[in-house]
Amino acid sequence: MTQKNKHIFVFGIFAVDLSFYVDKKVKPGETIIAKSSNIGPGGKASNQAISARKLGASTTLITRLGNDNFNSYANDIWRREKLFASTKIDKNLPTGMAGIFIDDKTGENSVIVDPGASAHLSIDDFYSQKSKMKKGDIFLTQFEQSSDTTFSVLKEARELGMITIFNPAPFGIIRKKAYQFCEIITPNETEAEQITNIPLKGKRDVERAINKIRDLGVEK
C-alpha cells in the first residue's frame, strides 16, 4: 500500500468550546462581565481529523453527538472541511461542551469539560467502520474516552494491521498491555513523566523515559 492510499481513522470526542476572556478570576457567588467571548469547535479527535483533512489526507472521524443544536453545528463544520464523520446520535445526552475561562492579560486558562454523548463512545462505534479499515491504514486516538474503550480500540486496530497512534491526553490510567498495541505514542513532557514516573530534569532522564516507554511495548 502506498502512502497516498492510507486512510486515517480518528476515534474520539467532539466538543463545542465556549470561550470567555476575563480580567480576573471569578469568586464563588460572583458574577462578572466577560471582555469578549466566542464559540468554536473543540475535542482533540475532531481537531486532529480536521487538520489531517486540511493537509489532504483521506480521513474519517468516529465520534458521538447529542440530539441538539450543537449537533448541527458540528456537522456544518465537518461538511465545510469535507470531512466524513461517522456519528452516533444519543437522544438522551447533549453534544460535548467545554467552558474555557481565559485571563485576558496572561493567557492562563481554566477549563470545564462535559463530554456529553462522547463519554459513551464504545467499541461498537469502532465496529461501525471496521469493514472500511485496511492493513496499513492509520488509526489515531486519545484519552478523552474511557480507558476500557481506549484499550479495546487500540487492540482491534493493531490486530487489523493498522498503524496505531496514541495521544495519551488528558492522561489517565490504562492497562499496561495497551501500550503493546501502540506503534507510535505522542506524550508531552508531563504525560511522559506520568507514564514512566521519571521526572524529566535533563537529557539522561528523557533517554530513560524513552527506554521505559519502549519497554512497555511501544515501537516509536
What are these regions (language model features)?
Residues I50, N75-D76, S131, F151, ...:
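Alpha-helical segments flanking ligand/cofactor-binding loops in enzyme cores
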Residues R53, R79, R158-E159, R214:
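Anion (oxyanion) recognition and catalysis
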Residues I13, T63-N67, D90, D104, ...:
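Cofactor-binding loop segments of dinucleotide-utilizing enzymes, especially the Rossmann-like FAD-
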Residues E159-K220:
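Conserved phosphate/ATP/ADP-binding segment of small-molecule kinases
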Residues K88-D90, I100-I138, F143:
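Conserved phosphate-binding/catalytic loop of the ribokinase/pfkB sugar-kinase fold
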Residues M1-R64, N69-N75:
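Glycine-rich phosphate/adenosyl-contacting loop at the front of the ribokinase-like
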Residues I77-N92:
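A glycine-rich helix N-cap at a beta->alpha junction
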